[in-house]
Amino acid sequence: LGKAPFMPDEYFGREFNPLDIGLENCQTMIIFPAVSGFVGGDITAGMMETVNCNELTLYLDIGTNGEMALGKGDRYVCCATAAGPAFEGAQIELGMPASKGAVDKVWLEGRRIKYLVIGNDRPVGLCGSGLIDALAVLLKAGIIDENGTILSGQELPILFRSYVFEVEAEETAQSTESSLAVHIAPGVYITQEDIRKLQLAKGAIAAGIEVLFKEYGCMPCNIYVLTFAGGFGNYIDKASAAAIGLFPQELLDKAKEVGIAAGNGAVSAALSKEAWERA
């Protein structure tokens, strides 16, 4: 995977002997066909289960490798983007998985930033959905500008000045970011460096979508439905994602969650020969 272009030895899409991997109580094992080295069989399975072949569909599976596909009928284009782990809470100062104590929802209510915590417990950090919400809220409140820079002093709306504070800057020669941070919940904050990492992840996904539009020769207005697959895609607030530029704003009304589409596709193929042949 470290060389470009990475060409896998096999694209699968066939039946295997379960005994080869030590599965003794299984009659047949099938592995969905991969599209390329970075677009695997999970995308094939998910699209088979959710994509309407007659309508132009944009399929997103957001994760460390943001895999996506666009098309209809017998023509699809796909790509994978190096979004990195920021949306999963990794490499964020107070980032964490979506578990007990994670702030998973953030919104603006009047002059206050409000939040929800998984398990209704003491807030410990921010998971992916909370991070996306937080960025959208900071932008809406005028706490960050359109470039993602945390504002200070007279630049800040007076109602939100108490949310911004200074943290100890890391003593690294490479760090050029300010030492400002923003309170989200008691003991939980987001730093300028965190925002930059989230911008990189967001930019990778947005760039992938733009490339698909260019390759397919279409525009956002041509899309019939935007589907979000996978666990993370089910939980992010689509309005917040559109507000920070993860996908075009005009697709917001066309966005929907399709659950664990790859798992559902695998079940369909296991139970139906017709579904497996279609994959």
What are these regions (language model features)?
Residues 41-49, 202-203, 255-279:
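Glycine-rich phosphate-binding/hydrolytic loop that grips phosphoryl groups
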Residues 71-74, 82, 109, 137-145, ...:
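Short, well-ordered loop/turn and helix-capping segments at boundaries between secondary-structure elements
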Residues 220-240:
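Glycine-rich phosphate-binding loops at beta-strand->alpha-helix junctions
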Residues 2-81, 110, 152-208:
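ATP-dependent carbohydrate kinase catalytic cores
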